[in-house]
A protein has these predicted regions:
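Solvent-exposed soluble domains appended to multi-pass membrane proteins
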Residues: 1-178
């Protein structure tokens, strides 16, 4: 199934995450992942956790950015993988690792998790479309425009991940939401 017309859930990444995972609309000038005390939200991760799913969240950057680590651990995720989880030499800019590195890392974790025969949910947050753009030198983009190049790269990286995932035994029982 593919949707060709859709709207962004907000301007900032935190809006998209809370909208997609917890069904909260974007509230301008408000980050629903932050608070004096880490807020509890009911959504897909918490419901799946109650049903016995082992939930993982992958991000390219530092775990504390936007209070993501505390928020996601409080709200249904068991494991958080972030810049602190990756080798230091894999970091390419202030937002952490490249998309293809994160997808390959996530694939290894998903394969390990699948061997335990426990259902799981994995959320993979990529950040390559945030400046400063870093397109790997080996990637051959069809354009010279940096913003178009990074979109080409991001598209290639997710396609590469899906091609590799398709070869895994857990693929046939997996739903991908992009």
């Amino acid at each position: 199934m593919a949707f060709t017309n859709f709207y962004s859930a907000g301007i900032h990444t935190n809006h998209g995450m809370t909208a997609t995972l917890y069904s909260f609309p974007a509230l301008m000038f408000r980050n629903l992942m932050k608070g004096t005390v880490t807020p509890h939200r009911k959504g897909l991760p918490t419901v799946l956790k109650q049903l016995g799913y082992d939930n993982m969240f992958f991000m390219t950057h530092e775990a504390q950015y936007d209070n993501m680590k505390a928020f996601f651990l409080t709200n249904g995720y068991k494991e958080i993988f972030s810049q602190e989880s990756y080798p230091k030499d894999s970091v390419v800019n202030s937002f952490g690792v490249s998309d293809h590195f994160e997808f390959d890392f996530a694939l290894q974790q998903l394969n390990t998790k699948a061997k335990k025969h426990q259902p799981f949910m994995a959320t993979i947050l990529t950040i390559s479309n945030h400046p400063p753009y870093v397109v790997p030198e080996w990637f051959k983009a069809r354009t010279k425009d940096p913003e178009t190049q990074i979109v080409e790269y991001a598209d290639w990286a997710i396609g590469d991940f899906l091609r590799k995932a398709r070869k895994q035994p857990w693929y046939k029982n997996t739903i991908f939401v992009i």
